């Protein structure tokens, strides 16, 4: 009988790979604890599995889970620099925003409401998307909390058009 190390909200540390293989207990970013809210956290991971606004092909909705799965390999410490980010920061994975496929405006509202809650609880939201459209809900939440913001959007291709297939 093997007793697996349980994720602890008291330490906000991912479990040691020597106590539980990295392919076990997958689902949370960096194998961090899951939390119901962002109270007491410095940062909160929030998935936004939405791709209804993608003009080419669907699939970005699988981004948050894909990122979470591969993030199991990330170590919170930098051996060369002797720094463990989790010694200084408290973070957890809050799961996914309750998006509504095919309903863009309702999903914008869900993103805005979720991230407004995270910001009001004092944490910095780190979003895992999702298509480009999720940014609008994120910016609305940030604007509510902090006022005017600027956005620099880096992408691998120039696809931010004013109209696509005759639609604005």
PLM-predicted stretches and their roles:
Residues 1-8:
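Short, Lys/Arg-enriched N-terminal segments with co-localized hydrophobic residues
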């Amino acid at each position: 009988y093997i007793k697996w190390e349980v994720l602890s909200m008291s330490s906000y540390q991912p479990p040691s790979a020597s106590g539980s293989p990295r392919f076990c207990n997958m689902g949370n970013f960096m194998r961090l604890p899951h939390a119901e809210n962002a109270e007491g956290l410095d940062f909160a991971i929030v998935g936004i599995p939405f791709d209804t606004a993608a003009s080419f092909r669907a699939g970005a909705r699988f981004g948050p889970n894909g990122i979470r799965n591969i993030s199991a390999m990330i170590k919170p410490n930098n051996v060369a620099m002797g720094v463990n980010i989790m010694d200084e920061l408290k973070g957890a994975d809050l799961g996914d925003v309750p998006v509504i496929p095919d309903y863009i405006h309702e999903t914008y509202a869900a993103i805005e409401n979720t991230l407004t809650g995270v910001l009001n609880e004092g944490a910095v939201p780190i979003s895992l998307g999702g298509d480009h459209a999720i940014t609008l809900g994120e910016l609305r939440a940030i604007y509510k909390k902090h006022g005017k913001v600027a956005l620099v959007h880096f992408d691998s291709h120039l696809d931010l058009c004013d109209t696509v297939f005759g639609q604005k």
